[in-house]
Amino acid sequence: MSDFLHLEEFLKIAQEEDLFTIIRSGPFICAEFEFGGHPSWLLRDNDIEFRTSNPTYVKHVTNFFNVLLPILAAFQFTNGGSIIMFQVENEYSISGKHDLEYLKILRTLMLNNGIVELLVTADNPNKGTYGTLPELFLMTGNFDQQVKTNLDRLKAIQPGRPTMTMEFWGGWFDYWGDEHNKNKTLAEFQYNYEEILKYPSSVNIYMFHGGTNFGFLNGAENLNFDEWETDYNSITSSYEYVAPLDEAGDYTDKYWATKELLEKYNPIKTALPSVPEAPQKTAYASITMEQELFLYDMLQTIQPVYAKNVIAMEKIEVNNGNGQSYGYVVYRKTNLNIPENAYLKIEGRICDTAMVLINGILVSPWLQKAADLNGFGTSRIVDSTLLLTKEAIQGATLDIVVENWGRVNVGVYKQFKGIWQGNGVKLNDEYIYDWTIYPLEFKSAWTTSLTGWSNFLSNSIGPAMYKGNLYISENPVDTFVYMEKWIKGIVIVNGFVIGRYARMGPIQTLYLPAPLLRQGNNEIVVFEHFRPSATVDFQNHHVYNNY
């Protein structure tokens, strides 16, 4: 993901385009991003308490800010840059914490690192001052309706100060297994946006431009903090958000409505530039899968770790002692004698989905429909139990492949991935010990160096990789990878994981921007959990459908 980390270049472009910039510098950013922006290796500190003045957490935040903030300070408006404002934390009132000393520490760190622009917090105004300190910060509001009520609350909290809607939600995001979110109609968007402008209040549309959770960087949501594990909802790779500009940069009805309202309420009439053409898109011809690589062969290329019992992926001793952050973890037990009618029990909850194989044969149910998320192999079930086989098998190899489907971004903090709750995994009434554990991370260098591929046969069942070639004769343009014929997995283009797909919906396509493609041959690899299709198709737009 290093190509996406050019912060200084991004800020230079904003300055060149004469834009003002508001920075949400963290350490928690929410944004439905994986773990709210926290790196998973923080979980290895047993005494850490996220989003508090806990010394361990503050130590890590300090180290982070001491690198990040000097970069940002150089781009402040007072230094000739575009940054006019810094948002401190995000919606702290619903964090499950109430440690205002923590907010003071963040402010001090920012001031000590040369930040001089306006510092603000952002919360739902009905929370009052629970997540802010009015004497230190300007409080802004996050909402999408009841505009006058919310802005009046902001005025009451901080009389004599300007009001700002920091997040005016113009749309919403999608969960896997849910319907495509259309809860903000054009009429609702227009009415509430105009109410803000009429008030008058400053306003930032969230999101103005839909985005993409490339790789494994989608977050997850829980609607009930007290019962979060039963209410886990993974967020799609697409963060299209039904925004004025969609994920691929196309204009929507909300864009034209926004333009019209800004022209109406802008007291300074200026000549507006013409609207640029939308980026070109195409539906490339379908490609045929040519090769396949099964899980057993994939794992031969990975250095395993050995453990008496199953452990969370973050606790695996890889990546220079930082553990595994993303992808999948495979728990393997060899030479296992399985009696007839044996049951496998995974104690606690699986985090987040699991496939079970015996001697390379998938024996667990497929996750094809939204209803399947309430069955075996998901985090919604406590002590998942599965009939392994009706017949006895001697000397078997048992594989449990667990997917990290995205960490919850707000409200839950000690959330490890893999199998780690309870006391382990049981075969009938006996715990299974002495595991071989493989971190399956899908790093680019590993993916592009794989060998041992065999010819594609199309009748494979279970987790495997499939490869085809997309040949582009001219300069590449944006496209959408259309995966409705497949079941569940990830798509990798030229070694880069562009995101996840799931036939259950609501979205059946993955946005593939032109810069990730090249003229000539493009390697398209699919890691499919259950059953492949013979082809990968393309569209020139997103496709939504539910199963």
Feature locations, PLM:
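Aromatic- and acidic-residue-enriched carbohydrate-binding clefts of CAZyme catalytic domains
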Residues: 1-3, 31-56, 225-242, 247
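Carbohydrate-binding surfaces of carbohydrate-active enzymes
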Residues: 58-71, 79-87, 93-94, 99-100, ...
